Amino acid sequence: MNVDRCWEQYYKTLKLIYLEENKETCQREIDHLVDTAIELKEKTYSNAVLDLGRQFREVCPKARIMWKTSSIAGNFYPPISISDIYSPVIANVFDQTTRLECRRQEYSLRMPLQEEPNFTGIQQHAQVSDCSLVVSLININRYKTTMPVVKQVAENLYATNLYFNGAQRRLVLVSTENIPTMQDDPTKQMSVHSANKINKILELGLLKLTSLSYHSEGSNTAIDTYRLCGWIPDISSINEFNFLKVHKAFSRGECLIAMGTGGFVPKENIFGVKLRKYHDYAVLDIDMINEVVTLRDPLISDTLLTINFDSIRKYFLQVYCNWDSSKLFMFTKDTQIFYSDKKFNPYQTLAGKPTFYLKNNSDRDEYAWVLLEFHLDKNNNTTAYLQEIPDRISTVRLGYNDNSAETGFQLIKIRLKPKQCIWYFCYSSTDKMLTFHTYSTSSDVVFVRSKMPGCDFDVTECAILPENIVPMQYPNHSETDIYYLASIDFSIEGEPGITIITDMVVCLETDDDLVNFQMFHWDDLDFNSPIYDEFYMNERMFEKKDLPLTSGERYRIVASTARPPISKGYQCAVSGINIHADYPCSYKLRESDVRYNSMMFKLPHVFTLASTGITKISLVNRNKYNKVFMRIYPQTQEDYRYNYRVISADTGEDLVKPGNNIQKLYGGIVIKEFLVSDQTNLELHLSFQDNGRVPVELKCQLYVGSVKIITLS
């Protein structure tokens, strides 16, 4: 029996149990492995198969997520330890064969990696743009315990575990067979200079992971160090850097430090070694007495730079720290979510975004850090961040000023008071798997995804239906045509009579739409008395702040646009402050078509109304009992007066009190709910008078709402 084939089938089954949802398929493959183990009679293989059976029985959703986020740019990096590598055939199952790009013509040869046993120190190759990676190698070589373990799998094939995509031990296979080599001098290769071959292998592994090229861009030392050894990345501006505070941690071996320049460096050589633009330097020492920092340029291994604090602040832009979580915290926990751009981002507000709370359940102060990490995949041009939610979420727009939002990592540090709870929202500019790493000094500190409690916030999102688009006017602004967009039933539930200071926003999907909304009391069916009379249109988003609303009351929100909307959906969100905290209240939003008085069955009808007679509309009701509401909207700005009757088509009896000399209000002509019984069919009679001599015809829209179905005759 071919041992390598047995191991290859083992690794295929290992992959299957985490990626295949069909348990029967997985069980058949495991049973086959058991038969193979019995026949092979090899202890290591038998133990591995037994452990695989245990993994299958204990597989959990979190483990599946880790496996399903293993693919990056055609390579598959499973979350398994290098201690689980038993055969080189593992490379056949977990394909990581993509070769690094090299654009240097003088390095056109491809040869196996050569060692440099006599080289002193660690030095970046001049043609490889990975200064941050080499600085990371310089730093972690000073702490041998942080060095990743590298295992040889076969000739010119090595394996290591790196930290990325939410996992602490993703398998990275590194081929050292095809290293760009100088055509004119085969002793020179594009590789970091080091006597330790492990540094060369780690460079290859990280370059393959992040850029698939020897010409990488966009990384920094904090991120590269995290991926190599898992120490928490902390990126800060040089102006925020506290030399004294960090020096204490640095001297205790709790952190690694690097510094990066920006676009401004001195032209002259004033430090013995000329500073380079946009370049990272390893920090080897901080002398608080003389206020100087000792740095190493990764391109020059045999020379140190000594720079005083003032010059550091003048010529350096950022500080990169990496913290040893095992020395700072006792507890860690990871939380994963998939952020859907389609689901969470159609509206540029915080409403509807994923929300989390960080809470200290203990009776004393506790420290907690939360590290957001977005997963590498086919699209890494992503902005992602976690941000504290203000008291009034609905009116706060998206935006984050921290450059770390574009690096794939963001670190939040906080000291939590006893029982303190802080709410956060999450944003990503694209579809992205995100991991939140929580580090804390107590198990009483929790980071949980949850919807915010009711009184603080509520939101509804709905589609815009094409038939909604009917010209209307606002009260006191009848000269301006607007288009009905949507209406929402809004209430504040709780102890009646409590004043809630409320913010409200209606947001559309595109900036090309101009939007407004008005609010009315529930019984104001004519929409003649808006709670505030403020008519103007805003691009995409209209918001009102500090509305003093009352619990126990119901309101109607009517949104409109300046022209037929381009957006296919809208969002309405509210938040507020309960000034009587002893009486909890909650918001409730529900889409409710106010044109039909929120009734279940809706019958729209467009007709023409002439000034020369009475227009009759016949309606069929086949129900023994029904409740009916009507709204008639003549599409005109003229101040005509209207008459209406609703009668039984069978007896001619009036079913509602006739309306005479009625003025069309903002909500049109409203015929309030009335009862219909005994399968009575209806007739609506409508007329108006025009004082002019020329006959006039008006286009009208009829909205009939009912408890049970009604149709046109």
UniProtKB/Swiss-Prot annotation:
GO molecular function, one term: cysteine-type endopeptidase activity
Any one GO biological process: proteolysis
This protein's UniProt keywords: Hydrolase, Protease, Thiol protease
InterPro entries: PalB/RIM13_Calpain-like, Papain-like_cys_pep_sf
Residues covered by the Calpain catalytic domain: 74-325
Catalytic machinery residues: C131, H279, N308
Top-level taxon of origin: Eukaryota
EC numbers: 3.4.22.-
Family: Belongs to the peptidase C2 family. PalB/RIM13 subfamily.
UniProt function note: Required for the proteolytic cleavage of the transcription factor RIM101 in response to alkaline ambient pH.
Protein's recorded name: Calpain-like protease palB/RIM13
Organism of provenance: Candida glabrata (strain ATCC 2001 / BCRC 20586 / JCM 3761 / NBRC 0622 / NRRL Y-65 / CBS 138)
Recorded name of the encoding gene: RIM13
